[in-house]
Amino acid sequence: MHTNTEPTQSSDLALLGLMQLISPALPIGAFAWSQGLESAFELGWVTNEQQLGEWLEGVLDDGLTRCELPVLARLQNCWAKSDSEGLSYWNDWLHANRETAELSDEDTRLGLALMRLLNSLQLQPQIEQGHAALPQDPGYVTVFAWLAQQRQIPVRQSLLGFVWGWLENQLAVACKAMPLGHTAAQRLIEQLRPKMVIAIDTALALADDQLGPIMPGLALGSAQHETQYSRLFRS
């Protein structure tokens, strides 16, 4: 009996591509950035597992849900439609919403690192030969969206992968700098898994005029991190 396996193989390849894109082993240097979390430890805002869970939930609700996640969906749709104007608009919008020099630097450097990796994998020419122009100074989310679209990863799965990668990175920071035990990190994952799904549902439902992060505490912590005397991370 002949069985058509092409759709299954295609979805499997997309899933594997997503797993590769969010892997901690991806050589783009994401491990070097804490997104302000190290400063929260230094300032005494986060000192235990419960406070860390509250911090991460706050960043998820007031940050990613209203900034990176909905814009990632828009950027991936722009890549699908070869909408160069939309790509430039949302890429610039993300840059404008990085409230400190370190957060802006993180986004830009990770985007450049991912572009270098794509070049090493001989994928960058596919961007240059496409119908949409790559925005000037593409940030990490913009390049992530292109690779997700190129690998035919559904938008919702792209968002799931992105938020999972964010959480893993934040918990890795906490395990190094807090320090947080690995079992405690797994408890926090269990606590935040359903909240990440809710965040994606919310992000996909937001209109353009509802977007924008509301994280004054993170911005203040990130700004103070620039002059923090002793630190492990670049943000």
Swiss-Prot record:
Gene: ureF
Any GO CC annotation of this UniProt entry: cytoplasm
Subunit annotation: UreD, UreF and UreG form a complex that acts as a GTP-hydrolysis-dependent molecular chaperone, activating the urease apoprotein by helping to assemble the nickel containing metallocenter of UreC. The UreE protein probably delivers the nickel.
Pfam families for the chain: UreF
Protein name, entry field: Urease accessory protein UreF
Glycosyltransferase recorded as keyword: no
Protein function: Required for maturation of urease via the functional incorporation of the urease nickel metallocenter.
Localization per record: Cytoplasm
Broad class of where this protein is predominantly found: cytoplasm
Stored HAMAP family: UreF (MF_01385)
GO terms of molecular function: nickel cation binding
Assigned keywords, A-Z: Chaperone, Cytoplasm, Nickel insertion
Entries under Gene3D superfamilies matching the protein: Urease accessory protein UreF
Classification of source organism: Bacteria, Pseudomonadati, Pseudomonadota, Gammaproteobacteria, Alteromonadales
Family classification: Belongs to the UreF family.
Domain of life the protein comes from: Bacteria
